[in-house]
Design a protein with these regions (language model features):
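Short, surface-exposed ligand- or partner-binding patches at beta-edge/loop junctions that are enriched
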Residues: 109-111
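Rhodanese-like catalytic fold shared by cysteine-dependent sulfurtransferases
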Residues: 2-6, 16-59, 72-106, 115-156
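Structural scaffold elements adjacent to functional motifs in cytosolic proteins
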Residues: 65-67
Length: 156
């Protein structure tokens, strides 16, 4: 009987922690993600492709590449776009870095594969940068699609 009571007590003490979560943070995420309905995403996609970037370059559109790769990554794969902002993801949301971001032109958020750029884009949009777009596939996809022609679009 004592063993059963001990087990029951242990379960009662552990159950609340299993179901516990940060309710305030969940409310913030709900406010952010509830805006991303299929209709909104269809009308205003959050991604920009290599093809889109090349078209923008061709048309001489004014946009900014926000390179959020780490310093080690930017040394490993050196080319960056002319006029790009290089702000590592772990420093992006510091007030002085957010102040560098334009509000009046597209921001293509770039990382190596596009995964971190997706997270950063969602967060940037959540704080008011609705002009931020994930550079789909990142620099890896750009290099794959453009190949040797990449030197036409980048500088060392």
């Amino acid at each position: 009987m004592r063993l059963i009571l001990s087990a029951l007590l242990a379960v009662m003490l552990l159950v609340p922690t299993v179901y516990a979560y940060d309710k305030e943070m969940a409310k913030k995420f709900d406010a952010m993600f509830s805006q991303m309905t299929p209709e909104v995403l269809t009308l205003r996609p959050c991604q920009i492709t290599t093809k889109d970037i090349l078209e923008m370059i061709k048309k001489k559109e004014d946009f900014v590449i926000l390179d959020i790769r780490t310093p080690a990554e930017t040394k490993l794969i050196a080319p960056v776009w002319k006029g790009s902002l290089i702000i590592p993801m772990h420093e992006l949301f510091k007030p002085e870095n957010l102040a560098k971001l334009p509000k009046d032109k597209k921001i293509a958020v770039l990382c190596h594969t596009g995964d971190r750029a997706a997270a950063a884009t969602i967060a940037l949009r959540a704080v008011g940068f609705n002009n931020a777009f994930q550079f789909k596939g990142g620099i890896a996809e750009f290099a794959k699609e453009v190949g040797r022609l990449a030197t036409e679009y980048v500088k060392e």
